[in-house]
Amino acid sequence: MLFYSDNNKDSYDSNHAIIFKDRIKDIQKTLEDITEFYRNKGIKPTIFQSITDNEYFESCKEIFAAHGYDVFEEENRYMVLLDDCRIVPNPLVEVRKAERWEDTFRTDIFEAAGEPWETEVAKAALEKDHTLFFVGYIEGRPVGMTYAHTKDGVCRVDYLLVATEHRKKGVGRAIIQTFAKYCMENEIENCFLWPDGESAERIYDEAGFRLVEVKKAARACYLK
């Protein structure tokens, strides 16, 4: 499975392949095809392991290396919204549910957080009907956001980002508190995520998310 965006070549979210072990016959030919596809587009190839294929990339590490890839493994800690939120939000942070894109989201959140490549991904997500998008404001200025995808009775939280200068002010907690409250009030069930680090996991735990499973995630990055 190949994802790509000619307009956002620096984003891993927009440009990556996923390999499913049971759908390929020749891993070497598959790697050659993936590498050629992305290099012809001027994109550095990144390949993700299917979450169902535990340890598959590790078992093929020498094959990946022979084709110019390095394999990295990390834990994905899956959390599900099961309990009531315990967060008391900072009253100076106002959180709103966004219905349309604003250019200040790009400058004041993504660029201010040092992640401009995620702008087009978030913008495209907001344009879809099944996306929940919440923005945190301080003194009327957007300083953080999160968004989630809802489909077929499942809600996956994709991203939580706060502008660098506004971190450690309770912005992330306020945003997640509003999001969790919205899900509970609107009976949005099966809401899950995997946190990016211990700090994020603590915030999600306070919001009522509980750790339910830990899986090994793997990706292969092209080094040439």
Where are these regions (language model features)?
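N-terminal charged segments
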Residues: 1-41, 56, 61, 116-117
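A conserved beta-strand-loop-helix scaffold within acyl/acetyltransferase catalytic domains
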Residues: 8, 115-164
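Short amphipathic alpha-helix that is part of the acyltransferase structural core
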Residues: 19-22, 72-78, 82-120, 124, ...
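Acyl-donor-binding surface of acyltransferase catalytic domains
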Residues: 27-93, 99, 217-221
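Conserved active-site alpha-helix within GNAT-family acetyltransferase domains
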Residues: 54-71, 173, 197-214
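A structural microfeature
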Residues: 73, 142-144, 213
